[in-house]
């Protein structure tokens, strides 16, 4: 569950990632079947053939490239989310000494842990971080840009993006390490989806 990218809506999994993967599957002549897996077990399941691909807002990092093949499908920033009543923080460095909530095993967690004297709380589910902020148990959240934008739009009286953390970074679809034929096929489909405007149409549906 990571709206607007992917979430379970009364038994139906939907979102930007879902529409994009459905389009890729269609161009490969297959039908995508989706399952929900805990975040920190995603690459493990992939390595033992529990599923063929992972699309879950996964930043492409050197460490992950050692574990899996990755096909870039988007780039985005990490953003800082705070209460509208708080003194706004616009950079990672300005979070020094503050209480930061993040999802475990994410780029956001790595960034939070790099902040001097920060009190970092890591949670299994990203939505817990928003509850922590809502209830005043943290000063800020570091989260993927699309999710921060979604919650700011959903509840502007509770959440506001005050700044960014780091540079815009690539996000990828993960395939089993060595699954080069499937990786190449998905890369080709992704290139076509970007070239013919389909990627923009899917993006506009969920983010505009």
Kindly give the residue locations of the regions a language model identified:
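Beta->alpha turn/N-cap motifs
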Residues: 1-2, 35-40, 49-61, 76, ...
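Extended ligand-binding regions for polar small-molecule ligands
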Residues: 18-27, 86, 93, 99, ...
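Short helix-initiation/N-cap motifs at beta->coil->alpha
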Residues: 18, 33-44, 87, 104-107, ...
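Periplasmic-binding protein-like
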Residues: 75-82, 127, 145, 149-191, ...
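Extracytoplasmic small-molecule ligand-binding "clamshell" domains
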Residues: 1-57
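A ligand-binding cleft/hinge motif common to bilobed small-molecule-binding domains
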Residues: 41-44, 56-66, 111-114, 134, ...
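Ligand-binding cleft/hinge of the Venus flytrap
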Residues: 5-9, 21-30, 92, 105-125, ...
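Hydrophobic/proline-rich hinge and linker segments of small-molecule sensing/allosteric domains
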Residues: 1, 69-91, 104, 173-177
């Amino acid at each position: 569950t990571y709206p607007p990218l992917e979430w379970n809506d009364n038994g139906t999994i939907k979102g930007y990632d879902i529409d994009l993967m459905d389009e890729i599957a269609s161009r490969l002549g297959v039908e995508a079947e989706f399952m929900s897996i805990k975040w920190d077990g995603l690459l493990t399941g992939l390595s033992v053939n529990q599923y063929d691909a992972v699309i879950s807002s996964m930043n492409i990092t050197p460490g992950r490239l050692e574990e899996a093949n990755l096909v870039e499908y988007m780039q985005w920033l990490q953003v800082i989310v705070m209460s509208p009543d708080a003194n706004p923080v616009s950079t990672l460095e300005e979070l020094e000494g503050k209480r930061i909530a993040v999802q475990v095993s994410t780029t956001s967690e790595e960034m939070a842990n790099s902040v001097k004297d920060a009190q970092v709380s890591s949670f299994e589910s990203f939505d817990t971080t928003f509850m922590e902020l809502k209830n005043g148990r943290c000063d800020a959240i570091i989260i993927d840009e699309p999710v921060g934008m979604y919650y700011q739009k959903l509840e502007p009286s509770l959440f506001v993006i005050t700044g960014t953390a780091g540079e815009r970074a690539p996000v990828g679809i993960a395939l089993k390490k060595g699954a080069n034929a499937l990786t190449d096929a998905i890369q080709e489909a992704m290139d076509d989806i970007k070239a013919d405007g389909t990627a923009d149409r899917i993006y506009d549906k969920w983010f505009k």
